[in-house]
Amino acid sequence: MIRSVLSLAAVATCAIGVVAHADVEDAQRVTHEHMRAFANPSGYAATYSSAGFIDTANPFFQSLGSNGRSCASCHQQSEGWTVTPEGVQKRFHASHGTDPIFRLNDGANSPLADVSTLAARREAYSMLLSKGLIRVGIGIPENAEFELLKVDDPYGYASAKELSLFRRPLPTTNLKFLSTVMWDARETFKDPASRDCLAGTTSCFASVHFDLADQSNAATAGHAQAAQPLTSAQRESIVTFELGLFTAQVTDHAAGRLTALHARGGPQHAAQQTFYFGINDVLAGDYRTHAAFTPLAFNLFDAWANPPAERDDGHERVEARRAVARGQALFNTKPIQITRVKGLNDDLHLPVIQGSCTSCHDATNAGNHSVPAPLDIGLTDKARRTADMPLYTLRHKLTAELIETTDPGRALLTGKWQDVGRFKGPVLRGLAARAPYFHNGSAKDLNEVVDFYNQRFGVGLSPVEKADLVAFLRAL
């Protein structure tokens, strides 16, 4: 078996960006042969593998289709196991737009785009190059409660048969924490024999291992254009590899080592974090312990609330650590009046819900929902549409109600009107490595993420509170 183990010194040489010598030393102190670290705008992120190494002989890294792609084509370790615009642009420049990620089936804005010249390829792959977006093609279900009334597609391709949906590739790391696979949950399967059931219902779900095995095959058939399905052994190998990966920030330019002074940042602590279906569920409480939901879902940086200074720490580093701790406290407890969220307010028949960030990011120290709960928080509304995004006008077949959206989300799987615009919330670890954010890449950085929620829910954050929240999020 081939083992790919790079020392931090080797990785630091080729990692993106230029960082201060002290940052490299900090990263060296918290990484070893089981982890690989890569620079990002906030510091360093690292991946820990429970197998003890990154096995580059795994089928994950092999071309198993007909177009040269592997899973790693769209899931780069150096980019948080997804892709970033900067990384995609480097590949375009190095290959003149012929790297396997640049394929018409889903890398281009339209599968009919002209790619005959370098300039044409740059135009054809503009969404991938500018926002790291892959085009997903899904049609309106025949039995849908709605119909497609109008299409405004700047690339002239989308129709009711196949809408063009531009989405970010989700990271293939920290998958231990998943309750839902894919943005629209299309790889999240029901299993009546399962014990993982929504509280008080008979809605039970297959294991994430099962979901990921199916997803690996579907991705190879679609993205890699494979003629034959993966073997059971290939699926199992890919899923086992993915489930052993844990990625998180290990150093921050301002706060330093994220394990200093008993803080519990970094991927090794993530690997040790308990997770199960229904842990700390916001609606039903903890499914196993039966404890009530606690908004204190994150406690990684409790020790930094009033940290002492280490030997070489200056005032700025101590203050940076306090900012991270304050941001964590804000994320846990800052009051938010949750309104107009489909999947929450409408399902519970409550126009206003008093909550906090962890009302929708309840999984302990992971930040996603611990049960399947796709929500519509307004990211696909016409008001947020940019000129490079298609816009779809949907009409309810019975009521004639209209919705204008850039992506109907889960509704294209269920056909249900109430599911228009619903998406899952992702795991929040390793955020600093993988801008832009949201399913459609509409937030270029974490400042824009915080601004969106502050404006959407009228949170009333002060400039200091915004900065503290960003400091916390980039430390994850």
Regions found by a protein language model. Name each.
Residues M1-S4:
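Positively charged n-region of N-terminal signal peptides that target proteins for export
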Residues S7-G17:
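Bacterial N-terminal signal peptides
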Residues A22-L476:
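Periplasmic c-type cytochrome electron-transfer domains
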